[in-house]
Each structure stands twice: as structure tokens, then as C-alpha cells.
């Protein structure tokens, strides 16, 4: 089922100009020739149709959030092709040829500025681009992330760790070419297959984290990204998602205790479990608003970054109650509810170590899966905040959750000019 989008261009509406698309050299932005309001209308129509069976009321949908047309993508994964003296940074284009995309209009300004300098740096280091057709060469990708303050994380993905010596030697030169470089690392991916990165990460810089300070409902929340951590690729969209979580959860759980945007002061502290928490975006936003939070994430590096953010919040004088655990979300939720002596389903609500008032899930594209959906359905939780980059898997999960209905929802255009988008929904257990 594809988006119901016409490809006709409206004469009155300006479109994003891209020479790569016009020349047929890159078609990653499949909807580039569709007006952005038409793109968004199609995404809204698809989300409404798929979630209609679970909507508790006709007016659950807020107006969709529209992304900037350009310069919104805070992370790029650039394939390194060409030669050691003249590298290209971009994609594998038509016919399997490397296509340089240093003038792509989608990345944030700092990434656009850094890309030509990174190509020069690679040439000065003499790194031979990896050729997947003959398994020769060394440098596979360069992954660049920009923070809201303009600092960069630069990751070089190579087939062997031997290039680290040159990276250490040339770090000063890299910072001359790219002054915004804060975190620099080498990822080792030795295998000859379509895998972006490997498990081994070698820090080249002294700094190990990229601070991402966001505006969440008017309050600053700083997340710390480590090289292998996940973060949404559109910073403005991430701020919208976290703000909706704080606002919507307050509306249904903490309306009697809010003080200046806070959930503090409730007779019974409001507790949330943030499953698939990543570096803690949703959980830290809720903790900053006064909730007690436990975040669960399989990737230990992300959990370490989330804990670092908690310590920084406390050092800044914020009274936050949050903990983050490295574990599989489904296994942890089942084990925790059993540990409390409430069996696999109903749990006690209350303190930081007790069952939650709210469950937050922000899973990968495949969704939370039947096991976790059925656990939520059988638990005593009444409120779920579900954020999804795949509304189809979200609908399948809601079907497995049975008694929950959508009471608030919004389409967030995280990935402009493509068929992909984020959907955030507040779910309540239906009564009667």
C-alpha cells in the first residue's frame, strides 16, 4: 500500500531545486516533484486510514507538522567512491557508479559546509575508497551528524583498523579543515556485504559525545550522542515528538499537578517506562517535566549516554528521577512485572521501581511486535505514548493491543520528499 500521492506539479507552488534529481543521478527523494503540501496530505490520509479502526473519537488528529523543505537533515551517511586523490562522497548511483552529492540541499548547513572539506581530508590522508565489486580499497563511508549548536560528529567507516594511525596523526589537520568537528571516530567494518557499520568503534578525538540541546515545550533538554547512538535525523521533528509526549501525557495523567509546565507535585508521582529509549529522548523529556522514568534500550552505548544526560541535569540543579537499563525491552518488561509479584500482566503503579502509569514506545520500523503488544494489553497500564516511523507496523501492533484506542495523534513529516513519516499517538485503555 503506497501513499495516495499525485505526481502532477502544481504551477503555483515552488518545488525544491535539485540538480542531481533533475539529471537522474539521485532519486532518493522519490516525492521531490510533488508539492510539499500534497506530500503531507497524502501522508495524513494514509495514517488516518490505517489508524481509523483504533480511533476513539473523530477529532483525535492534530494538524500535521510540516518540515522545512531543505537543510533539515542532521545526519548523512556518505558512500566513499572515486579515487584516493579525488574521492566522491555520496551514494552508489545508477549503474553501480559512485555519485558525489556534496551539493545536496537536504543536510543542515554545517554538514553542507563540511562535506567538500572532508573529501579534501580523505585525499590528503591517501585513503583509497573501498570498491565492493572487487573487495579492494579501505574507506567505505563517512557518517556526519550536526548538533543544534553546529558541532559535528564525524565517523569514518573502514574495512580495517590500521587506518587509525593516520587518523590520529591527521586529527589536527581535520580540525583545520572542519573546525566544527567535535567527535571523531573510526568504525571498523571488515565484511564484504551490505552492512553500514561494524561493532568496533575507535575514538580518535578526546570528546566522546555530541550534545544535542533541544527545546521541549519551552524547556531545554540535552541529549548526549555517542558514535553508534540513534537519534532522529530531523532535529526540529524530534523536538515536536518530545514536546507532544510531555504535553499529551500531562493532559491525561498529570493535569492536577502541573506547575509551570511541570508534572511535579502530584500526590502520587507519575511513573513512565520508556521502552526502546535510545539515548533517552522521550524519557529525559518526561523526567525534565517531573515524571519518574525508567528507560530500557538494548544498546549499551546509548544507555551510557542517557545516564550521562541524567547526571548533567542533576549537576545543573534539576531534581530528576530517572534510570536507564541495558536490556531487551520485551524481556525486561516481563521480568520486571514478574519480579514485582504481579504475574505477567497487572502491575503495581507507584515508585521508581514499580509499575508505570505510562509506557512510551519508539520502536524501529518493524514495530514493537506481538509479544510486547500482548504484554501491554495484559498489563495494568492505561496510557501508552507510541511514536512510529512506520504507521503500518504501528497499526498491526495496535490490533494486538486490543483494548487501547487512539485519543490523540499527529503526523510529523520527519522525512520530507519521501513516502516515509513519523506518527505519534497517545493511547488510552478503553473502558466498557
Question: Positions of the model-derived regions?
Answer:
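Mid-to-C-terminal catalytic/tRNA-binding core of tRNA(Ile)-lysidine synthase
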Residues: 138-139, 373
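Short, acidic/hydrophobic/Gly-rich beta-strand patch recurrent on exposed beta strands
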Residues: 90-94, 155, 306
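Short, aliphatic-rich beta-strand segments
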Residues: 81, 144, 150-159, 222-226, ...
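Rossmann-like S-adenosyl-L-methionine
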Residues: 1-8, 163-168, 172-432
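Nucleotide donor/acceptor-binding cores
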Residues: 74, 152, 269-270
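Short, solvent-exposed loop/turn segments that connect beta-strands within catalytic domains
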Residues: 83-87, 148-151, 216-220, 317
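Extended interfacial segments that mediate partner engagement and assembly in macromolecular machines
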Residues: 5-11, 15-16, 25-135, 143-149, ...
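General beta-strand recognition
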Residues: 88-90, 153, 385
Amino acid at each position: 500500500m503506497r501513499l495516495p500521492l499525485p505526481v502532477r506539479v502544481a504551477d503555483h507552488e515552488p518545488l525544491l531545486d535539485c540538480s542531481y534529481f533533475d539529471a537522474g543521478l539521485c532519486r532518493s527523494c522519490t516525492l521531490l516533484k510533488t508539492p510539499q503540501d500534497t506530500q503531507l496530505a497524502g501522508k495524513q490520509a494514509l495514517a488516518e486510514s490505517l489508524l481509523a479502526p483504533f480511533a476513539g473519537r473523530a477529532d483525535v488528529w492534530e494538524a500535521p507538522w510540516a518540515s522545512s523543505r531543505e537543510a533539515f537533515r542532521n545526519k548523512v551517511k556518505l558512500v566513499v567512491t572515486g579515487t584516493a586523490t579525488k574521492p566522491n562522497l555520496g551514494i552508489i548511483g545508477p549503474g553501480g557508479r559512485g555519485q558525489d552529492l556534496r551539493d545536496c540541499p537536504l543536510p543542515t548547513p554545517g554538514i553542507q559546509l563540511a562535506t567538500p572539506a572532508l573529501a579534501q581530508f580523505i585525499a590528503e590522508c591517501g585513503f583509497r575508497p573501498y570498491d565492493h565489486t572487487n573487495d579492494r580499497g579501505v574507506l567505505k563511508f563517512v557518517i556526519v551528524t550536526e548538533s543544534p549548536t553546529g558541532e559535528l560528529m564525524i565517523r569514518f567507516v573502514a574495512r580495517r583498523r590500521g587506518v587509525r594511525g593516520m587518523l590520529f596523526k591527521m586529527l589536527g589537520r581535520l580540525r583545520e579543515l572542519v573546525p566544527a568537528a567535535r567527535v571523531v571516530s573510526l568504525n571498523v567494518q571488515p565484511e564484504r556485504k551490505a552492512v553500514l557499520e561494524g561493532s568496533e568503534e575507535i575514538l580518535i578525538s578526546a570528546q566522546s559525545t555530541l550534545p544535542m540541546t533541544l527545546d521541549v515545550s519551552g524547556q531545554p533538554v540535552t541529549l548526549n550522542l555517542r558514535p553508534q547512538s540513534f537519534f532522529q535525523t530531523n532535529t526540529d521533528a524530534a523536538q515536536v515528538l518530545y514536546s507532544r509526549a510531555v504535553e499529551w501525557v500531562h493532559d491525561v495523567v498529570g493535569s492536577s499537578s502541573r506547575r509551570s509546565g511541570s508534572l511535579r507535585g502530584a500526590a502520587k508521582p507519575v511513573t513512565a517506562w520508556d521502552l526502546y529509549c535510545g539515548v533517552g529522548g522521550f524519557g529525559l523529556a518526561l523526567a525534565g517535566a517531573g515524571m519518574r522514568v525508567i528507560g530500557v534500550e538494548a544498546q549499551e552505548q546509548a544507555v551510557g549516554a542517557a545516564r550521562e544526560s541524567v547526571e548533567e541535569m542533576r549537576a545543573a540543579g534539576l531534581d530528576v528521577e530517572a534510570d536507564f537499563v541495558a536490556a531487551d525491552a520485551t524481556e525486561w518488561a516481563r521480568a520486571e512485572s514478574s519480579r514485582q509479584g504481579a504475574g505477567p500482566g497487572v502491575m503495581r503503579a507507584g515508585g521508581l521501581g514499580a509499575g508505570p502509569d505510562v509506557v512510551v514506545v519508539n520502536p524501529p520500523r518493524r514495530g514493537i511486535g506481538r509479544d510486547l503488544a500482548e504484554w501491554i494489553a495484559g498489563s495494568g497500564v492505561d496510557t501508552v505514548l507510541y511514536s512510529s516511523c512506520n504507521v503500518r507496523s504501528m497499526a498491526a501492533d495496535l490490533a494486538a493491543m486490543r483494548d487501547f484506542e487512539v485519543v490523540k495523534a499527529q503526523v510529523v513529516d520527519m522525512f520530507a520528499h519521501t513516502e516515509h513519516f513519523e506518527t505519534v499517538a497517545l493511547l488510552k485503555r478503553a473502558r466498557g
